[in-house]
């Protein structure tokens, strides 16, 4: 049994959270959304969900987290170091890896815990460029449930796709409900209201 699955099973054995999840094919690649992302604990739950499902997954983290002495452990747990100064390069790199057959689920938390300004669009661009399905993972403290919801295919019609996403997350509160933001990409906002585009 892998280190990640062992850690996940230990987590669920003692956790107060209830795992309510749909099945996801283990032998495929995809994007796994973790939302609402209102606390760092949301991300821990997403990793535990993916580990329990025995998915081969990776996640993105600040490059500073991968320095000694914890860098090796972070990579063993599926971490990919990210230099946020070059988000476009990261999208290209991940898309190329998947196209070459490096199949894995990429855990993404597009809603930053500090911004409160909606979702970043990196997950959408990666999913479209690599033709990957998107699985909607969730955290809902009001019911103390968490897990994987439906898997969708993005069509390229951003407002329509995000309407599907918003419908699913409408009753999901995250770990800290007061910090929840509406799932909305900047690309949905009219140009005159959008301000400076977010490269990530």
Locate the predicted segments by residue.
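Short hydrophobic helices that act as membrane-entry/anchoring signals
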Residues: 1, 5-16, 71, 75
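Short alpha-helix boundary/capping motifs
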Residues: 1-2, 39-40, 64, 116-117
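Non-catalytic C-terminal accessory region of glycerolipid acyltransferases
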Residues: 3, 7, 14, 87-200
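N-terminal signal-anchor transmembrane helix
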Residues: 10-28
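Conserved protein kinase catalytic domain
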Residues: 12, 47-50, 74, 149, ...
């Amino acid at each position: 049994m892998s280190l990640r699955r062992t850690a996940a099973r230990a987590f669920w054995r003692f956790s107060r959270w209830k795992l309510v999840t749909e099945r996801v094919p283990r032998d495929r690649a995809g994007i796994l959304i973790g939302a609402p992302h209102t606390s760092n604990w949301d991300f821990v739950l997403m990793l535990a969900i993916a580990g329990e499902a025995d998915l081969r997954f990776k996640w993105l983290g600040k490059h500073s987290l991968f320095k000694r002495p914890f860098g090796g452990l972070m990579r063993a747990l599926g971490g990919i170091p990210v230099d946020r100064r070059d988000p476009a390069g990261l999208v290209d790199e991940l898309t190329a890896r998947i196209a070459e057959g490096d199949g894995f689920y990429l855990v993404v938390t597009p809603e930053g815990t500090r911004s409160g300004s909606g979702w970043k669009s990196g997950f959408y661009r990666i999913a479209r460029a690599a033709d990957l399905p998107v699985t909607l993972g969730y955290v809902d403290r009001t019911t103390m449930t968490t897990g994987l919801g439906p898997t969708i295919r993005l069509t390229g019609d951003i407002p329509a796709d995000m309407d599907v996403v918003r419908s699913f997350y409408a009753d999901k509160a995250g770990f800290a409900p007061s910090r929840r933001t509406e799932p909305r990409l900047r690309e949905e906002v009219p140009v005159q209201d959008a301000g400076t585009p977010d490269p990530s």
